[in-house]
Amino acid sequence: MATTPYNYSYIFKYIIIGDMGVGKSCLLHQFTEKKFMADCPHTIGVEFGTRIIEVSGQKIKLQIWDTAGQERFRAVTRSYYRGAAGALMVYDITRRSTYNHLSSWLTDARNLTNPNTVIILIGNKADLEAQRDVTYEEAKQFAEENGLLFLEASAKTGENVEDAFLEAAKKIYQNIQDGSLDLNAAESGVQHKPSAPQGGRLTSEPQPQREGCGC
């Protein structure tokens, strides 16, 4: 029986990190479903989503792990950092506390992922300009000082959501092309021409769980 060909050439593993309530699940849903969830449930542990994109003529399947922001789940969610090719680190532009905690999230990301993991800083809820509590300029400076990509976005309107995931993928693909990302390394977070059945995952991690409400 003939094997069904893949309709993508690479798999990139992403994680989404940041405080509870910054809109991580809403960003994931907007990217994968093109819809805004007004009542995004709190993520319990992790949630999973996928989407196929195109970068430089290559079809790439993004496997995206949305991690819980509550401190009580940090021990569980840290295990999902390993083997991530990209990380979206999210804060809420209307809540300075979520911005102030970025250094802690960045420390975890740098300690638990490989040195070539692409990290993009996302200032979510850009549609709430009147309630802004973190300036674009200071967040951009933080990103530049720490070697991060940076965008402000809105999970509600969809502004820059596509770009957030695509810009990280472009950088990862660039790292593959220039040889700075070793695809043979288990922690690279990238699979090229995967041999597992379609729908297979990069890891054998348990199914994510959700409950409650919030974002």
From Swiss-Prot:
An example Gene Ontology CC term for this record: lysosome
Tissue distribution: Widely expressed (at protein level). Highest levels found in whole brain, spinal cord, heart, kidney and lung.
Official protein name in the record: Ras-related protein Rab-14
Regulation: Regulated by guanine nucleotide exchange factors (GEFs) including DENND6A and DENND6B which promote the exchange of bound GDP for free GTP. Regulated by GTPase activating proteins (GAPs) which increase the GTP hydrolysis activity. Inhibited by GDP dissociation inhibitors (GDIs) which prevent Rab-GDP dissociation.
A Pfam family matched in the record: Ras
Cofactor(s) this protein requires: Mg(2+)
Span(s) of short sequence motif Switch 2: 68-77
Catalysis: reaction(s): GTP + H2O = GDP + phosphate + H(+)
An example molecular function term from Gene Ontology annotations: GTPase activity
Subunit structure: Interacts with ZFYVE20. Interacts with KIF16B. Interacts (GTP-bound form) with RUFY1; the interaction recruits RUFY1 onto endosomal membranes. Interacts (GTP-bound form) with RAB11FIP1 (via its C-terminus); the interactions doesn't mediate RAB11FIP1 rectruitment to membranes. Interacts with RAB11FIP2.
UniProt family annotation: Belongs to the small GTPase superfamily. Rab family.
Lipidation (S-geranylgeranyl cysteine): C213, C215
PANTHER family linked: DRAB11-RELATED
EC identifiers of the protein: 3.6.5.2
Compartments, as annotated in UniProt: Recycling endosome; Early endosome membrane; Golgi apparatus membrane; Golgi apparatus, trans-Golgi network membrane
Motif placement: Switch 1: 42-47
Binding site for Mg(2+): S25, T43, D66
Single biological process term from Gene Ontology: apical protein localization
